[in-house]
Amino acid sequence: DVLRLCLWTKTRGIRLIVDESFVDFSCGMPDNTLLKDGILEEYPHLAVVKSISKSYGVPGLRLGILASADRELAAWIKKDVSIWNINSIAEFYMQIFGKYEQSYVRACNRFMKERDRFMQELSRVPFLNVFPSQANYFMCEVKPPMKARSLTGLLLKNHSICLLYTSPSPPD
């Protein structure tokens, strides 16, 4: 589907930016990334961004990449977008990161199995409509008669789970 979108945007002269920050958690990993020379060269209007710190669970390191075959875009980014310096801890992390790649792949595979199990369990809750996910989170619709605001209160009171309620609808 994403490659079809790449083709569609290419034929219309539209730049496409794809965020792959959570792609490591999706089925088909690691082969389902767009971060491949052949794909980037075939679709020079494509820019792929990925937060390494999100995927690998090291948010304090603030590591990420942007890849594109569009040299003008790369030159513009180098010129006009401030680049953060990488501190010594992040630099060391990048040096040892390959050593643990197979362990990371195994952990992602375990995560995918657990995600499937967890979705089945969530789907058993009568007032939730759980949408399938390839990420490390689920989107759920709270169905009547339960109200989202009431659910957040129950989860906090009964299970010490704190959720942020952000609906613009009036409170129940």
Which positions does each model-derived feature cover?
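Conserved PLP-binding catalytic core of the aspartate aminotransferase-like
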Residues: 111-112, 116, 122-158
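PLP-dependent aminotransferase class I/II
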Residues: 45-124, 128-131
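Residue-level detector of structured alpha->beta connecting loops
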Residues: 13, 44, 126-127, 160
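Hydrophobic residues at beta-strand termini and immediately following loops
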Residues: 49, 163-164
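Conserved small/polar residues in nucleotide/adenosyl-binding loops
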Residues: 165-172
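Hydrophobic beta-strand scaffold residues
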Residues: 16, 162-163
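Short amphipathic alpha-helical segments and helix-helix/interface helices
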Residues: 2-7, 35-40, 74, 98, ...
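Active-site pre-lysine segment of PLP-dependent enzymes
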Residues: 1-16, 22-55
